[in-house]
UniProtKB/Swiss-Prot annotation:
Coiled coil regions, renumbered to chain: none
Protein name: Short-chain dehydrogenase/reductase prx6
Enzyme Commission number: 1.1.99.-
Binding sites annotated in the UniProt record for NADP(+): I27, D70, N97, Y174, K178, V208, T210
Higher taxonomy: Eukaryota, Fungi, Dikarya, Ascomycota, Pezizomycotina
Function: Short-chain dehydrogenase/reductase; part of the gene cluster that mediates the biosynthesis of PR-toxin, a bicyclic sesquiterpene belonging to the eremophilane class and acting as a mycotoxin. The first step of the pathway is catalyzed by the aristolochene synthase which performs the cyclization of trans,trans-farnesyl diphosphate (FPP) to the bicyclic sesquiterpene aristolochene. Following the formation of aristolochene, the non-oxygenated aristolochene is converted to the trioxygenated intermediate eremofortin B, via 7-epi-neopetasone.
Record GO terms (molecular function): oxidoreductase activity
GO cellular component: cytoplasm
Class of this enzyme: oxidoreductase
Annotated source species: Penicillium rubens (strain ATCC 28089 / DSM 1075 / NRRL 1951 / Wisconsin 54-1255)
GO biological process entries: secondary metabolite biosynthetic process
């Protein structure tokens, strides 16, 4: 990210554990520790105040703060960004790591014997609110506050999942949110890079031994199929320290490997491509100015 005379500032969302043990290892917790060890100032964000306060005991007091907030609540999340900017005067990176899995069953097997008029309740879509809306909210807030950095711009790295590409049948809604995140990132990346000097990319972990994964599932997996958190941290570092201008990249973190995933080729060539090429009058009508993309249709 170039040279800096002041420590860089990162917001790490999803920094608290989902278990009763507030310091049980998780991607957000380990990411916060890793960034602090490299000299970053880190704003840790999570829903659990007690877990956040416990986390701070394991971080440098002069470089880490905790902010209790729900990323699916725009006002709460915006308040965090505002407080961080007022505290440190800049936001260089958003690590959008908050995430949960399905909290209800879409398959409703327990309702097989219900009468036709006994309609099941709506599914709990908290997973959509946190995993997808939280990323969209965080991205918009990052755009706003990174415009006010001493050198405008910054980095956004999102924790996705390999389930976005190869869906897990146990968690269909979770995998749907992660697939949506991938396409959202690819959709906004060119404009953020060109107009805002912001790069947005995604890391996709496989099975990581964290609180979001049931311990019984970990026990049922052979060791070579487990991805160490350290591999995910390498993925984050790849994007946070990139000097080549990567944007819209999707990076699988699998065991000890980092693997890039690319967009498929258009099935019907230029006809398929034309359907998703920016038409400038529509872009201006939707967003207030032209995109300026090199392949846009005037």
């Amino acid at each position: 990210m170039g040279s800096y005379t002041e420590p860089r500032v990162a917001i790490v969302a999803g920094a608290t554990s989902l278990t009763r043990d507030p310091l049980q290892s998780g991607i957000g917790i380990d990411l916060a520790k890793d960034l602090c060890s490299k000299g970053w100032k880190v704003a840790c964000v999570g829903r659990r105040q007690e877990a956040g306060e416990a986390l701070l005991k394991d971080l440098p007091q002069d470089r880490a703060y905790f902010f209790a907030a729900d990323v699916s609540n725009y006002e709460q999340y915006a308040s965090v960004f505002s407080k961080v900017h007022h505290l440190w005067g800049r936001i260089d990176a958003l690590c959008a790591n908050a995430g949960i899995v399905d909290t209800s069953s879409l398959y409703i097997y327990g309702s097989k014997n219900n009468g036709v008029d006994n309609i099941p309740p709506a599914p709990d879509l908290s997973v959509v609110d946190i995993n997808y809306k939280g990323v969209v909210y965080g991205t918009q807030l990052a755009i706003h506050f990174m415009r006010h950095n001493p050198q405008p711009g910054g980095r956004i790295v999102v924790t996705g999942s390999i389930g976005a590409v190869f869906p897990h049948k146990t968690y269909p809604v979770y995998c749907g949110t992660k697939a949506a995140v991938n396409h959202f990132i690819r959709g906004v990346a060119p404009l953020l890079k060109q107009k805002e000097n912001i790069s947005i990319n995604c890391v996709m972990p496989g099975i990581v031994n964290t609180p979001i994964v049931p311990p019984e599932m970990i026990a049922a997996v052979t060791p070579e199929c487990i991805t160490p958190v350290q591999t995910v941290l390498r993925g984050y570092e790849t994007f946070l320290e990139d000097s080549t201008g990567m944007a819209g990249e999707i990076l699988e973190c699998s065991a000890d490997k980092l693997i890039y995933y690319h967009m498929p080729k258009p099935g019907n060539g230029h006809i398929t491509k034309r359907a998703v090429t920016v038409w400038e009058p529509l872009f201006r009508m939707s967003h207030g100015e032209v995109s300026g993309l090199p392949d846009a249709i005037p």
